[in-house]
Amino acid sequence: MSVDTAKSDIQAEPSTGTLENKSSKTYSDSENNSTLDVSAQVLTLDNKSRILCIADVRGELSLINSLVEETNASCVIHTGDFGFFERSSLPSISERTLRHIVQFSPLIKKLPRSKNFDYYPSNPIGDLKNSIASHPDCLLSELPQFLSQEKKFSVPVYVVWGACEDVHVLEKFRSGEYSIPNLNIVDELHSYLLQIGDMKIRLLGLGGPYVPFKLFDNGDGKGTIAGGQGTMWTTILQMGELIETAKSLLDREEARIFITHHPIGREGVLSQLATACQADLTLSAGLHFRYGASYNEFCVNHSPEHYLQKLSAARAQFMEVYDTVKAEVEKMVTPEQHHLINNVVRLVSRMPDATNSYAMNNMLPGTAFKNLWNFNLLDASFGWTVFVVENGHVQVESKSHGFNLGYRRMASRRNENYASHIPRSTSENTGTYYYANNRLVESQAQFTKNREATATPTEEEQIEGYDQEHTDELGMSRANTTEESAETHEVIEEKSGPPAAEEEPISGVAEKPSPNEEEQPAIGGKEEVDVEEVTKGTGNLELGETTTEVTILEQENAANVTRSQAQEGRRTDMQKGNDREFRQYSGEQRYERCGFHITPCNSEEEARSYFKDGTDSLITNIQIRTSLNRYKSPQAPQNVNPTNYAYVFVENQNAVSKALGSIKVPEGVRVNIMRDDSYYRQNRGWYRNNRMEGHGTGMRTNRGRGRGGRMNRMQHPRPLQSGGSVNKQSAEPTTHG
């Protein structure tokens, strides 16, 4: 059993004659009391002609002529939302539909920006309708200009109506009241034939979107078409009439194109209807995509069974609606309409039934599973598709506006800009670090740049300034620290000996080196120092006095001790740990983060409200996080309630001290000073990635606990932690509100 059995109704009346000797056949529309001719209407084109396929011009009908000129097309196929509106359509359009039309109308977008055409609910619908009605041109569509022949189509245009159309305007075209040269409406009653060289292409169409619960509702429409309040939809009578039309015009020499507004791949009933019409290609609107799509069911279904399941679901949905309204519908329809409904019901009943396991296991998808090719078209403003027919070969050309992926260029700059979002400390540890020969080396260029950019000198810079000033008083360069220590030693040795008999300046007197100095290598180019320079600023005391000796020694010792502390302060915990053979962190660049950790906290505004007396101006960045971020599993553990907390960053540790006394939080809210020592920034298994990267770090891990037991623990102690200096973020007591 095959799904292709849906073609049996059409094959029951085969046609072997050519188009020229085929007799005309008519069907009556009982509601309109008119007879419609479905005989073939032929358009003869040259070989290698081009067929332009577009969708959704939305009333900008003149765009069709522009695209025809661009693509050098011989005819046009349009798949819905054509713009069948006139001025009299405005009062009957519902508010929701009118706002949708105004939002996407290309005619209104060309107008100067004005609140009169604002489609948001803040603009009253009455004002919006008055603005559209008072405009000199019909903003809903250019159709009135084509009806008056002020504008004309340059080539034949074949259209089906879409979702946003006026059903009353369509009925005027069907009754013959309205007519536009070169405009042909393809529907369930009207089919057209394209003769391109020796190739015949039959156009079959079905207008409106497929809405299952509206299949038996005609709305304000008369006859088989349905619509109301500015919208239209497909009915079961249209589908039944289309089956009759396809049956009456069957010709084995023709290639068939089935034109719909609703994408066929999304609805199993429409897919089955295309199979019943023996279509080779289908054209549908593309749901306003920026790229066109071409596919068959074999492309989008991983197996024939999956395709049959889609048909089965569509069958169940249709039959559920039909069984609900069947009794009421049979009382209202005429015998002709009942025949059309039975055509569709018989078509759907041949689709797979999920409740029949034998049929599902033994049914085949048919040849349409691979041979029926579907095209979803672009909106006319975003692109087009062109069929080039040459000697029976159908080629496809396509153009699309596409998506702008230029924002990807910024991805490479995100890491560079990341530093600008992280508050920098004013300490000297903010340079660029890299490792060479297991030693931490600081980039001098980056270090100098950061030092110059610092407006306020740090404590270390003040120390260096004092050293430089004091060394200038001694007449030495800072680089001669060894010479300075040696000369200080000489002065101490001299004063520890017998007192001088003569009080003469040391300048110009050759001193006898001490025995210790004789053993040391001589330093060339050493300048002699005047005692007056040494004693400058100390009250011009004499060398022989003990007070002078003590003062000089205290100053020198204080300078040396302070310099040693400053040099030791520059050494980070990572450097100290590196000297002790501890594995250094070689990941992303480190930044010392200064600020507070507030929990619970749900928003930036809430975090700023805790900073009183204007201290919120010290805040440079706020990050809101949740406590469930620590878990790797996407599902939150049970018995764990997520808690939002905030990281509040400030410029430096001085800003932390200023803001600390002005933080006022309610009861139940905790404020901690963030601790971001180098130790906590290293690649620790217990600190990063939930103990999954601890191998090789010397820490206890969850690896190696099998037959061999745990890995050997590290034999050296952990690196030293910060001593709590100003430039280091140390742990401080929690501040409670």
UniProtKB/Swiss-Prot annotation:
Q: Which UniProt keywords apply?
A: Phosphoprotein
**Key word Kinase present:** no
Modified residue annotations for Phosphothreonine: T456, T458
Q: Where is the composition biased (Basic and acidic residues)?
A: 486-496, 568-579
State the source organism's domain of life: Eukaryota
Q: Which GO terms describe its molecular function?
A: catalytic activity
Keyword Phosphoprotein present in the record's keywords: the answer is: yes
PANTHER family per UniProt: DUF2433 DOMAIN-CONTAINING PROTEIN, GLUTAMINASE A-RELATED
For this entry, the protein name equals: Uncharacterized protein C16H5.12c
The organism encoding this protein is Schizosaccharomyces pombe (strain 972 / ATCC 24843) (Fission yeast)
